From Swiss-Prot:
The keyword Transport does not apply. It catalyses: thymidine + ATP = dTMP + ADP + H(+). It is found in: Cytoplasm. It comes from Clostridium botulinum (strain Loch Maree / Type A3). GO terms for biological process: DNA biosynthetic process; thymidine metabolic process. Zn(2+) binds at residues 145, 148, 183, 186. One of its GO terms (cellular component) is cytosol. The active site is at 89 (proton acceptor). Its EC number is 2.7.1.21. This is Thymidine kinase. Pfam families: TK (PF00265). ATP binds at residues 15-22, 88-91. Keywords: ATP-binding, Cytoplasm, DNA synthesis, Kinase, Metal-binding, Nucleotide-binding, Transferase, Zinc. Homotetramer.
Length: 191
């Protein structure tokens, strides 16, 4: 992704689980490193599925990151000479991430955010809708529906093989749920 010279900007990579959001974030960060740009990658501390320290894609690609408890901590840990900032699992951050990302971009830095645009209910997730609104570049990518093989834009949460209910909590840490990519037609959220 190429942006204006001597200006900061925001990029968002959004989509359902298994669409390659983290792989795309890692790819963009690696390209910046090849170009000798200073990079820093942040992720929410609660994302410890594959690694506590690294951002790891489902395919196993990984890149070193700084786990943070809140979006405010990104500013505290951001180094002065960083050119490109990556933020994975942006949906798990609080709404102040939008203001923080804007502040960073306004200081002539490139910010790349990756995350789920919708929760398992098919509703906008965390700060992602606002990030997509203020970003200069937005890529909404799809996975493949596990039921019908059409393009998937939603994440289906399954508990013991059955769709999670609308009343279930949006974020479940360490629970025995699983996820599948689904298209609009095959996505189910029972009441």
């Amino acid at each position: 992704m190429y942006g204006p010279k001597d200006h900061g900007w925001i990029e968002v990579v959004a989509g359902p689980m298994y669409s390659g959001k983290t792989e795309e974030l890692i790819r963009r960060i690696r390209r910046a490193e090849i170009a000798k740009q200073k990079v820093q990658v942040f992720k929410p501390e609660i994302d410890n599925r594959y690694s506590k320290q690294d951002v790891v894609s489902h395919a196993g690609d990984k890149i070193q990151s700084v786990p943070v408890r809140s979006s405010k901590e990104i500013l505290e840990k951001l180094l002065d000479d960083t050119d490109v900032i990556g933020i994975d699992e942006a949906q798990f951050f609080d709404d102040s991430l939008v203001e923080i990302v804007s502040k960073i971009a306004n200081n002539n830095r490139r910010v790349i955010c990756a995350g789920l645009d919708m929760d398992f209910k098919g509703e906008p997730f965390g700060p992602m809708p606002k990030l997509m609104a203020i970003a200069e570049f937005v890529d909404k990518i799809q996975a493949v529906c596990m039921v019908c093989n059409n393009p998937a834009t939603r994440t289906q949460r399954l508990i013991n093989g059955k769709p999670a209910k609308k009343s279930d909590p949006v974020v479940l840490i360490g629970a025995q749920e699983s996820y599948e990519a689904r298209c609009r037609k095959c996505h189910r959220v029972p009441k």
